[in-house]
Amino acid sequence: MRKQEILIIESRSDQDIYDGRCEGDTLKRVLQLQGVSAKSIEVVNEKMFIKALNIAKRENIKYIHISAHGFDEGFTLTDGDIVTWRDFDRLAWPILRGKCICFSSCSVGNGVAELFTLHKSFCNAIVAPTRNISWGEGLVAYSAFYHRTQSHEKSSSQNVKVMNHIVGAGTFKLIESPFISRTYTIGAFMNNIF
């Protein structure tokens, strides 16, 4: 079994759970079709969120994908607790150092750069939406983003431009660390092309 390169952490609202809306498992299946190994974990509270973050310590995990309801100042867990950027720094520093974080959370791109004022090396880079996005927009845009990260010839800034071309100009933003802004190529070339 190949080592996981993407950790998907999802924290849905109670209404999302009731309605059967989720992103994590669907994105994991899309990634598997692309030859990328991912782990998807659903968390409902801060204790489970911390436990999931600790999985990111594995050196083969390069991308942390967080799917939760968000806003400029942070994001919300299933139990209703709000994780502000200061809280996230407290919970995730230095675990996410050297990783790339992708948020599928409404509007977090408008405030998440605060993490780099708390720690310049919090992570290598962040991709996040700057407006409210639908579940479908997030899934389609990130499916394209991760597909493109399989090529050494594509940069993260180019990949985010493609995401914006798909769902609308200015929707997603790449925020690079002032310390190290390296991103990663993932997966292996697919032998099973139909």
Identify the meaning behind each predicted range:
Residues 53-88:
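A glycine-rich, hydrophobic loop/mini-helix early in the fold
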Residues 1-59:
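A domain-level signal for caspase-like cysteine endopeptidase catalytic cores
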Residues 13-17, 46-48, 70-74, 107-110, ...:
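Short acidic, S/G/P-rich loop/turn micro-motifs used as interaction or catalytic elements
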Residues 82-92, 152-194:
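Caspase-like cysteine protease fold
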Residues 6, 38-39, 101, 124, ...:
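Hydrophobic anchor at the start of a short beta-strand
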Residues 139-150:
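Short, small-residue alpha-helix embedded
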Residues 1-2, 55-60, 93-97, 120-121:
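Flexible, charged surface loops at secondary-structure boundaries
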